[in-house]
Design a protein with these regions (language model features):
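Ligand-binding cleft/hinge of the Venus flytrap
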Residues: 62, 66-71, 75-76, 125-128, ...
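A ligand-binding cleft/hinge motif common to bilobed small-molecule-binding domains
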Residues: 104-117, 166-170, 193-194, 198-230
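Short loop->beta-strand "edge-of-pocket" segments that line small-molecule binding or catalytic clefts
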Residues: 37-44, 145-163
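Acidic, polar ligand-binding/catalytic clefts
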Residues: 75-148
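Extended ligand-binding regions for polar small-molecule ligands
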Residues: 58-67, 138-141, 148, 153-154, ...
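Extracytoplasmic small-molecule ligand-binding "clamshell" domains
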Residues: 30-103
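N-terminal signal peptide c-region/cleavage motif recognized by signal peptidases
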Residues: 18-23
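Periplasmic-binding protein-like
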Residues: 43, 128-133, 204, 212-253, ...
Length: 276
């Protein structure tokens, strides 16, 4: 009788353990519904997606919350040195200064390497594909024939950005002397509109939101060896165990896309939606 009792006890313990391990999947969603609010983390100063004036991600966050029958509690936060830092601070642990974590974080790169390095989060539901583009003045460059068409002319980029790294290193630095660094891509694009620059290298979304189909400017894809031509997808992230929340958000996003609401959100900010 001794060994059967041990096996029985072991079976009960494993069953209890399984219940304990599976509980958080619904416990997170239950807790959120009890609170009445969906806490959504968005980056600060990332126009046109999120800024003091709102943005695409802010509108998506509001639409997702409404789909789930909840109020929106927005948590804007400054970007860390790496996306992994942001996932730790805003998704699974919280910041040492006392804010976070949120229920879900938006604008997370849907990348296999990032997923592999961050096993405490679930990255899912890509909703946009970002790319780098060159905006240029047709007056300054009446005939565009690649990036070399702007050689010797001033080109604006945002500080500490992919565009800045690419342009400063292109062609052994042949554009370096004419690169102008700006606090944000929006400011660079505003100077392009004012005739102070010949071109701006920036994210496609940034360019579209500022230029708004202005016929005086062209937008072109420029090939860089260190940049994938297809760009990168962005989506959401929740805690790994929050499976019910992830499923609910995935379903809500699918409904927003099918109804055309996602397209309308992007259109309000002058950006063409690009499905990942």
């Amino acid at each position: 009788m001794f060994f059967p009792l041990i096996r029985c006890a072991a079976t009960l313990m494993l069953a209890c353990l399984a219940l304990t391990m599976s509980a958080p999947a619904s416990a997170d969603m239950d807790k959120i519904r009890q609170s009445g609010s969906l806490k959504v983390a968005v980056y600060k100063d990332m126009a046109p997606f999120s800024s003091d004036d709102g943005g695409i991600d802010v509108d998506i966050a509001d639409a997702l919350a409404k789909k789930l029958g909840l109020k929106l509690a927005l948590l804007p936060f400054p970007a860390g040195e790496e996306v992994g830092d942001d996932l730790r601070n805003m998704v699974w642990k919280g910041h040492y200064l006392g804010y976070g974590p949120a229920d879900v974080m938006l604008h997370v790169p849907v990348d296999r390497v990032l997923v592999a390095r961050n096993d405490k989060v679930e990255i899912f539901a890509p909703y946009y594909r970002e790319t780098v583009r060159l905006a240029y003045s047709k007056d300054a460059v009446p005939r565009f024939d690649g990036l070399d068409s702007l050689q010797g002319r001033e080109i604006g980029v945002e500080k500490v950005s992919i565009a800045a790294v690419l342009l400063l290193g292109e062609g052994d630095g042949k554009f370096r002397d004419k690169v102008r660094i700006y606090p944000t891509a929006v400011e660079a694009l505003q100077d392009l509109k004012a005739g102070k620059l010949a071109g701006v290298l920036a994210h496609r979304s940034e360019i579209e939101s500022v230029l708004r189909d202005d016929a005086r400017f062209g937008i072109q894809q420029v090939a860089f060896q260190r940049l994938p031509a297809q760009g990168w997808a962005v989506g959401m992230a929740v805690k790994k165990e929050a499976r019910d929340l992830a499923q609910a958000l995935q379903q809500a996003l699918a409904e927003l896309t099918a109804s055309g609401e996602m397209g309308r959100i992007f259109a309000r900010h002058g950006v063409q939606p690009v499905t990942p």
